[in-house]
């Protein structure tokens, strides 16, 4: 499969970025499910993409997860939320997917739907 991650204009590029972000989030959720977590989806506009929860030795393991693909960076609000989590002793994980891994997954393992 041959795919292009560059749009011809800013509107098209924003649409591509949104789809790539959703795909990255789906990959991260699948990985967390494989580790035994339950996924809690949140509304858009939150400081993180989803929360992952599991019980370990009768204790609740809660992780706030922010997923970024390629060269994407966290916003100021997300960085502030990450710092707040660190101060509060709460788990926050930045799940980064390099472009090479995304390309591999798109070519070999997963259905990317209308991204093609």
Question: Where in the sequence are the language-model features?
Answer:
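Basic/aromatic recognition patch in beta-strand/loop cores that engages polyanionic ligands
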Residues: 45-49
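Active-site-adjacent loop/helix micro-motif of nuclease/hydrolase catalytic cores
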Residues: 42-43, 71-80
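Conserved catalytic cores of phosphodiester-cleaving nucleases, focusing on short active-site segments
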Residues: 28, 32, 50-52, 58-71
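Residues at the C-termini of beta-strands that transition into short coil/loop
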Residues: 43, 68, 96-98
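Ordered hydrophobic segments in well-structured contexts
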Residues: 38-40, 51-53, 62-64, 91-93
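Glycine-centered loop/turn motif at secondary-structure junctions
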Residues: 36, 86-89
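Acidic-basic catalytic patches of nuclease active cores, encompassing PD-(D/E)XK
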Residues: 1-44
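Domain-level recognition of nuclease-like catalytic cores that cleave nucleotide substrates
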Residues: 15-19, 76-83, 90-116
């Amino acid at each position: 499969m041959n795919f292009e991650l560059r749009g011809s204009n800013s509107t098209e590029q924003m649409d591509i970025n949104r789809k790539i972000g959703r795909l990255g989030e789906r990959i991260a959720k699948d990985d967390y499910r494989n580790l035994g977590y339950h996924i809690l989806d949140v509304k858009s506009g939150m400081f993180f993409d989803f929360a992952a929860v599991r019980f370990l030795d009768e204790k609740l393991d809660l992780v706030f997860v922010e997923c970024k693909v390629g060269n994407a960076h966290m916003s100021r609000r997300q960085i502030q939320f990450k710092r707040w989590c660190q101060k509060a002793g709460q788990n926050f994980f930045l799940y980064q997917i390099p472009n090479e891994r995304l390309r591999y997954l798109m070519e070999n393992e997963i259905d990317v739907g209308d991204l093609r």
